[in-house]
Amino acid sequence: MGARASVLSGGKLDAWEKIRLRPGGRKKYRLKHLVWASRELERFALNPDLLETADGCQQILGQLQPALKTGTEDLQSLYNTIAVLYCVHQRIDVKDTKEALGKIEEIQNKNKQRTQQAPAAADKEKDSKISQNYPIVQNAQGQMVHQAISPRTLNAWVKVVEEKAFSPEVIPMFSALSEGATPQDLNAMLNTVGGHQAAMQMLKDTINEEAAEWDRLHPVHAGPIPPGQMREPRGSDIAGTTSTLQEQVAWMTGNPPIPVGDIYKRWIILGLNKIVRMYSPVSILDIKQGPKEPFRDYVDRFFRVLRAEQATQDVKNWMTDTLLVQNANPDCRTILKALGRGASIEEMMTACQGVGGPSHKARVLAEAMSQVTNASAAIMMQKGNFKGPRRTVKCSNCGKEGHIARNCRAPRKKGCWKCGQEGHQMKDCTGRQANFFRENLAFQQGKAREFPPEEARANSPTSRELRVRRGDHPLSEAGAERTGTSFNFPQITLWQRPIVTVKIEGQLKEALLDTGADDTVLEDINLPGKWKPKMIGGIGGFIKVRQYEQVAIEIFGKKAIGTVLVGPTPVNIIGRNILTQMGCTLNLPISPIETVPVTLKPGMDGPKVKQWPLTEEKIKALTEICLEMEKEGKISKIGPENPYNTPIFAIKKKNSTRWRKLVDFRELNKRTQDFWEVQLGIPHPAGLKKKKSVSVLDVGGAYFSVPLHEDFRKYTAFTIPSTNNETPGIRYQYNVLPQGWKGSPAIFQSSMTKILEPFRKQNPEVIIYQYMDDLYVGSDLEIGQHREKIEELRAHLLRWGFTTPDQKHQKEPPFLWMGYELHPDKWTVQPVKLPEKDSWTVNDIQKLVGKLNWASQIYPGIKVKQLCXLLRGAKALTEIVPLTKEAELELAENREILKEPVHGAYYDPSKELIAEIQKQGPDQWTYQIYQEPFKNLKTGKYAKMRSAHTNDVKQLTEVVQKIATESIVIWGKIPKFRLPIQKETWETWWTEHWQATWIPEWEFVNTPHLVKLWYQLETEPIEGAETYYVDGAANRETKMGKAGYVTDRGKQKIVSLTETTNQKTELQAIYLALQESGPEVNIVTDSQYALGIIQAQPDKSESELVNQIIEELIKKEKFYLSWVPAHKGIGGNEQVDKLVSSGIRKVLFLDGIDKAQVQHEKYHSNWRAMASDFNLPPIVAKEIVASCDKCQLKGEAMHGQVDCSPGIWQLDCTHLEGKIILVAVHVASGYIEAEVIPAETGQETAYFILKLAGRWPVKMIHTDNGSNFTSAAVKAACWWADIHQEFGIPYNPQSQGVVESMNKELKKIIGQVRDQAEHLRTAVQMAVFIHNFKRKGGIGGYSARERIIDIIATDIPTKELQKQISQIQKFRVYYRDSRDPIWKGPAKLLWKGEGAVVIQDNSEIKVVPRRKAKIIRDYGKQMAGDDCVAGRQDED
């Protein structure tokens, strides 16, 4: 009888009773049919409980079907009934029995087909299991074949560059993504990085240098290649420009192999290192907020530089906590200090938004900030599903609402607060049974079940449970604390039917707890009192019952009084009328999914941050919130054995009296392992495939549905304090993912993916896009079937503890998803409304531009250039900006565009992608990506000027790169381009200027604003045209300059300039030559800057002078521009150089000064680096630094670079446990030598230095000005060991930055091993061993020991090579060419071989046979005079 009572309930029962017995008939299925079917199954020896599930019905149908042909009519009726029941369980919409039988037959046929296809699919899968992990794999024939790099990898690389912007993290990410790649794959990765031309040019230069070095070290063997042997790769082959893919695979898989992919990858990483250094040249100490700089911009600069800092994570955390506040401007600093140490970055940015003006404004804001609500950081509370509205708190002592008895200020009422009698307290009152458990309850098992701890529940397989909680009158807090068991509620899981023993008017009965039943119905019980007859809809039809009022019922010691019905019910039922009185709730437990293991960072312990004091109001609010969370199993109480703590606080919700609990997890986040975000971006609707049926779901209480790893829970401990320390604080820890913890997003995404995986496999026809807690579900099923699948998905998620609230379940279009509006056959952005304003502030315009940028992805033609021009310069957010005429016109055009709604189409994989680009006006481009005309998948705009001097072709290539990157991300492939440019113009540009080998597939489209090149540069000198040697010079101090030219026909002209620079004078000289010359001209310059601008063929520029040069170039018929190195004795160049330098240049003519100045302007390198890199005297290198205004910071010490030469050590004394530790650090490697010395004297220090010099090559020591380091003993030791000693800047710890940092690191390690050693000196040596041998990191992932050995080993051959080079460079070579009998020279000797020499003549490197070369020693330029500095500098 039990099975008959619980086969169907709720919505399924309603669906059952709507199905007709026959098509067109009147009779419908009723519960009596299920009762009959249950009895019939018992006759056939089948378990009636199988009727409760779809799988059970399927098993019954499988047993009955073979007997149908020979069975009776009753057997056929039974089969029909179970077939209809199966459809109800599966939520298949049927109207009658015949339709249900048809559906069953259809399902059975599909199952047969799957069974037949399974072996074939298994064979196919076996054949296709080729490794996808590496680009080169072995096929079935044993041949090595290449797999193209996947769009997913390219997408990840593009995201890395876009998000990290060449910060140091880019290099290991590139290395990981390019594992095993061929040069062609590596070029594909480089070509997807479109918007970083300067960085790509640097990378190209590095690759060219490395390729040339490869060719020098691997000369080509003379003679033909033997048959069957491959040629050896040249540098350009390794770079993938002159080799085919087949050759690359053959080299990489040959015997012996030549790993061209790894070699090319190494070159790229060298280039990336240079780029990273260029993008991160600033010290974190220099990052200070300007007086009017927005706080948001300051924070961006701070963290961008912080990521590039070479420091430990602890140091970086300290910098974030202290330097960020210290270096803010005074107004922001006042606010930040008022916020306190608990403030997050988001709170700081909210507080400091728009700050400026007088200091009193900052104080006012700081006071107001105490009431600011940060909704984004608030921790969402997850309520139980069936608890009803939250009850207001009422005092049991005075009877007033708003506080509890524990906090009541009224005189304490005598006696019991429940019954009023004296002699006992409320918790002992017999009228209220506070303790739910007794020694023996009338359970079937004979004992009361205990409520398991939260840890067990979190991993239990239950999908839902019943729990009895407190009644309508809550216990006082004092009572709850005294009883100690008020939260150990009975728990009944629903894996079995919830049948318990209850006491009704003293009689014991077994009854089913049924939250779906309205009334309590019992059978075979005699109750006292009057009754009245009643008819109710029961199991098997209507039944007649007797209704008794005011019946006493007791369950688990809880008493209730209510109405009871007595009649012929198949099972005794306790309905909602009694359960609600007892506080019984239906609870969804924490997800039973497997927890993700989480650890702390190596060597770190959990947070031990003290709880700061809280107001009484906040303590009360937190106590209530935590009680609710504990009931729901999200947190658990802990004892004093847990030593960890994280501070908590509470803030009020905006426009509400309710409170939010916030936990300051910053310290735990610093100590928690790092996580990789499993999703690199949000999905775009243009990449969605068109689906017949769509639904959008939202997962409720997402984080609180996923359990936290059991071993990690202790680190989330927090404490609720008491007012005036009245009682010890209440301690809790989290059982679920906490809000604000760094691991919650990644673990939730990973868990959700695992949960959805089986559903995706079982339902391949259903597409699910998952982003955090938003789910987009699409299919080509009919709407009824689709909704059944949605219900299956919701049920699947519910089984794992994830609820999908009905109010956020979108069933009908349009669907609002991720900021978009989705329709069945089209999509658009959610409606964009532009505000109408008389006056616009900076903040208004920023929001307006953001809206227009968002709308531009589907509304073609939107422009924002003029609006963005209004935001130039550092302006306050509240500053009113007048609109220019151009901006007003642009805004009016955009309003017109947005009036008509525009929709995008969905992606069809069977059709090709087409991208069409149009030029809208000056520096503004729009594009559309579509598959069918007039049905755009996506539109966009481009209006960036990436360089000051550009032209339309260059901008068009940037647009193409942007579209290609977008397409790879969204669709995984590159579209065919339709470009407004002639084929000849396009191909000319790509041939001359593109930095890599990839050219997209494209075709010409004749739309307005055709792109063209306005002038053409000749590639060879023009015969018969006059040659102009041009040059310019300027004095940095006086800003005076000269520009001029000298021609090969004797003409010359020099003009004086004021308020100019070296770069401007070089351009002015070219402009002068263009003005004075005829229609055809050759110009020779020694300026790389000017050459780079003009070779790019710009047709517009931000510089007025460059625009004037462009106008002159357009007038020329032919124009040739060449570059020669400065100060090399080249005739015309040397003449014009002397003319323009007269009275202008102060610095001597030394080879490398110009390059050093250019590099210093870019990188602000120190004088030592320039002296080394460009072979300059120290006095000249220091003069360059001294003349740079950015390197002379007023009122501040100069922050130079740490000298990392191989022989430099920093020494310092530090103190621990009252003893002195002398520490020496090898600056370049971080290797440590340390000892405990008896006294801080010169003698002990000198002995330590000599011992250090006996172990390692020490050339220089850098110390502070302590008396022991300045002593005569130390000076004597340094003199004897030939060690140079330098001293730091007094009272400036940064001058000893390396050793100071290592002191902290050493002390930290000593603290970790101190309990293992009896004496401090032992612990110091243990810590030194750990640091040098057991800690790896930095470049290459080496330990300090490996790094110092590698540095010394590399330094020895480098010095030997330098000796050989210096010997060779003392010689000069005079030589003859094969056809020219005249001797040329002198040239530099680079290498001398048996049969030939390699020489450098000017900038050209040549190979000359020994018989045609004369090698002589160079004795200097005697003609120039002995004291000619210029002459001496030309000697190498």
UniProtKB/Swiss-Prot annotation:
Ranges where the record places region Interaction with host CALM1: 8-43
Q: How is its activity regulated?
A: Protease: The viral protease is inhibited by many synthetic protease inhibitors (PIs), such as amprenavir, atazanavir, indinavir, loprinavir, nelfinavir, ritonavir and saquinavir. Use of protease inhibitors in tritherapy regimens permit more ambitious therapeutic strategies. Reverse transcriptase/ribonuclease H: RT can be inhibited either by nucleoside RT inhibitors (NRTIs) or by non nucleoside RT inhibitors (NNRTIs).
According to the UniProt record, where is the region Dimerization of protease?
490-494, 538-544, 577-589
Positions bearing the site annotation: Cis/trans isomerization of proline peptide bond: G223, P224
Q: Which organism is it from?
A: Human immunodeficiency virus type 1 group M subtype H (isolate VI991) (HIV-1)
**What Pfam families does the database record attribute to this sequence?**
Gag_p17, Gag_p24_C, IN_DBD_C, Integrase_Zn, RNase_H, rve, RVP, RVT_1
Q: Write out the ranges of the annotated region (Interaction with membrane phosphatidylinositol 4,5-bisphosphate).
A: 73-77
Q: What else is known?
A: HIV-1 lineages are divided in three main groups, M (for Major), O (for Outlier), and N (for New, or Non-M, Non-O). The vast majority of strains found worldwide belong to the group M. Group O seems to be endemic to and largely confined to Cameroon and neighboring countries in West Central Africa, where these viruses represent a small minority of HIV-1 strains. The group N is represented by a limited number of isolates from Cameroonian persons. The group M is further subdivided in 9 clades or subtypes (A to D, F to H, J and K). Resistance to inhibitors associated with mutations are observed both in viral protease and in reverse transcriptase. Most of the time, single mutations confer only a modest reduction in drug susceptibility. Combination of several mutations is usually required to develop a high-level drug resistance. These mutations are predominantly found in clade B viruses and not in other genotypes. They are listed in the clade B representative isolate HXB2 (AC P04585).
Instruction: Name the residues that bind Mg(2+) 3.
Output: D1212, D1264, E1300
- What are the boundaries of the region Disordered? 110-129, 447-482
In Swiss-Prot or TrEMBL terms, this protein is called: Gag-Pol polyprotein
How is its cofactor bound, per UniProt?
A: Binds 2 magnesium ions for reverse transcriptase polymerase activity. Binds 2 magnesium ions for ribonuclease H (RNase H) activity. Substrate-binding is a precondition for magnesium binding.
| Keyword Zinc appears in the UniProt entry | yes
Q: Which CDD domains match?
A: HIV_retropepsin_like, RT_Rtv
Q: What are the record keywords, sorted?
A: Activation of host caspases by virus, AIDS, Aspartyl protease, Capsid protein, DNA integration, DNA recombination, DNA-binding, DNA-directed DNA polymerase, Endonuclease, Eukaryotic host gene expression shutoff by virus, Eukaryotic host translation shutoff by virus, Host cell membrane, Host cytoplasm, Host endosome, Host gene expression shutoff by virus, Host membrane, Host nucleus, Host-virus interaction, Hydrolase, Lipid-binding, Lipoprotein, Magnesium, Membrane, Metal-binding, Modulation of host cell apoptosis by virus, Multifunctional enzyme, Myristate, Nuclease, Nucleotidyltransferase, Phosphoprotein, Protease, Repeat, RNA-binding, RNA-directed DNA polymerase, Transferase, Viral genome integration, Viral nucleoprotein, Viral penetration into host nucleus, Viral release from host cell, Virion, Virion maturation, Virus entry into host cell, Zinc, Zinc-finger
